């Protein structure tokens, strides 16, 4: 079992984030112990949290992550959509870079003609 402090330290997240996941029901503590009802998480919960963090890093929204976690058969479709969105973003960035490169080349050519 891991405490909130251990999980936050090991996975680089804040207590606020972990408590938020509990509040919205995406990741509940395995047990609550002692008078303070301290939250503790077993290895399965830690693995689930690692998935949540990876999915967020990949651009999934929490509702999408909830669907993936509750309906594993939905994972492929959701991840395919995320890949499509990321590819669209890459294409947009590439077009912007190409436009900037053209503007720089035009600017350089214009500077050369004035000499």
Predicted feature residues:
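Short, charged amphipathic alpha-helical surface segments
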Residues: 53, 65-115
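Basic helix-turn-helix/winged-helix DNA-binding cores
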Residues: 1-63
């Amino acid at each position: 079992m891991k405490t909130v402090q251990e999980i936050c330290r090991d996975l680089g997240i804040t207590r606020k984030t972990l408590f938020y996941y509990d509040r919205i029901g995406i990741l509940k503590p395995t047990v609550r112990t002692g008078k303070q009802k301290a939250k503790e998480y077993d290895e399965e919960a830690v693995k689930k949290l690692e998935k949540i963090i990876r999915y967020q890093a990949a651009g999934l929204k929490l509702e999408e992550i909830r669907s993936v976690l509750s309906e594993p058969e939905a994972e492929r479709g959701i991840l395919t959509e995320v890949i499509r969105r990321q590819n669209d973003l890459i294409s947009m960035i590439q077009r912007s870079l190409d436009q900037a490169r053209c503007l720089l080349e035009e600017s350089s050519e214009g500077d050369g003609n004035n000499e």
